[in-house]
From Swiss-Prot:
The histidine box domains may contain the active site and/or be involved in metal ion binding. It holds the Pfam family FA_hydroxylase. It is a multi-pass membrane protein. One of its GO terms (cellular component) is endoplasmic reticulum membrane. Keywords: Endoplasmic reticulum, Iron, Lipid biosynthesis, Lipid metabolism, Membrane, Oxidoreductase, Steroid biosynthesis, Steroid metabolism, Sterol biosynthesis, Sterol metabolism, Transmembrane, Transmembrane helix. This is Delta(7)-sterol-C5(6)-desaturase.
Length: 271
């Protein structure tokens, strides 16, 4: 078993060398404990992903496609976006503690993770990944709902994110603009799922970082109309009503539990 777990350590060490070695001499990060190296790598990767994706996204929809996707008077101000960036950057060091913790758990054999797809085969890999995503979808839905329904959680945690409740205050940069504990709680299902279902290690890490892109997507206020995806059209309604569309990747949970509100139907009512 110890030899098998070494594969995870070797993989995270490779990621550390790849990221940290690109931005600083090894004498700076080499002496750090392995877990702290992982946190620093996750932090650098998270910051880069947030800014690169956010700036490219905003440049495209607010400038290159000005008045195509977003009406001119609905484009958020620079002040609003800078506030979102400030909130996200204060939370980022704390966000990165979660993937660092999950890596530690995996490296120590506390989870059901496997290192190589060949360990289980492609069919099992796809089935396990699908079950993992269902658990994540279910967990995030209920965590998100409780952050609204439990008044102290909303007041002291989730309200930080819901100051952005109109189209002209929402932007891709709002995607990670949470109280640190709020952001961590909503990502916890990714770690809980590792205890319940076998999951490919690299896919797990990739899905956690995909959250940064996904949350940017659902805060751009552009309804993609891709069924059954819980896109920005649905999430914008959530920011307006606070009582609908708690789901994450799909509309499945909201449909099952009666909290779904369709943006197409909403637009039809306004006409």
């Amino acid at each position: 078993m110890e030899d098998y777990l070494k594969q995870f350590v070797e993989e995270t060490s490779f990621y550390n060398r790849l990221v940290l070695g690109t931005f600083m001499p090894e004498s700076w990060w080499g002496p750090l404990p392995h877990m702290l190296q992982g946190w620093l790598r996750n932090y650098i990767g998270g910051v880069l992903l947030y800014f690169i994706s956010g700036f490219l996204w905003c440049f495209y929809i607010y400038h290159l496609k000005r008045n195509v996707y977003i009406p001119k008077d609905a484009i958020p101000s620079n002040k609003a976006m800078l506030l979102q960036i400030s909130v996200a950057m204060k939370a980022m060091p704390w966000y990165c503690a979660l993937p660092s913790l999950s890596e530690y758990m995996i490296e120590n054999g506390w989870t059901k993770c496997f290192a190589r797809i060949s360990d289980v085969g492609w069919l099992s890999y796809v089935i396990y990944a699908a079950i993992y995503l269902v658990i994540v979808e279910f967990g995030i839905y209920w965590m998100h709902m409780e952050l609204h329904d439990i008044k102290p959680l909303y007041k002291y945690l989730h309200a930080t994110h819901h100051i952005y409740n109109k189209q002209n205050t929402l932007s891709p940069f709002a995607g990670l603009a949470f109280h640190p504990l709020d952001g961590i709680l909503q990502a916890v299902p990714h770690v809980v799922a590792l205890l319940l279902v076998p999951m490919h290690f690299s896919t797990h890490i990739a899905l956690i970082f995909l959250e940064a892109l996904w949350t940017a997507n659902i805060h751009d206020c552009i309804h993609g109309k891709v069924f059954p995806v819980m896109g920005a059209g649905y999430h914008t309604i959530h920011h307006r009503t606070y009582r609908h569309n708690y789901g994450h990747y799909t509309i499945w949970m909201d449909w099952m539990f009666g909290t779904l509100r369709d943006p197409v139907e909403e637009d039809a009512k306004k006409m």
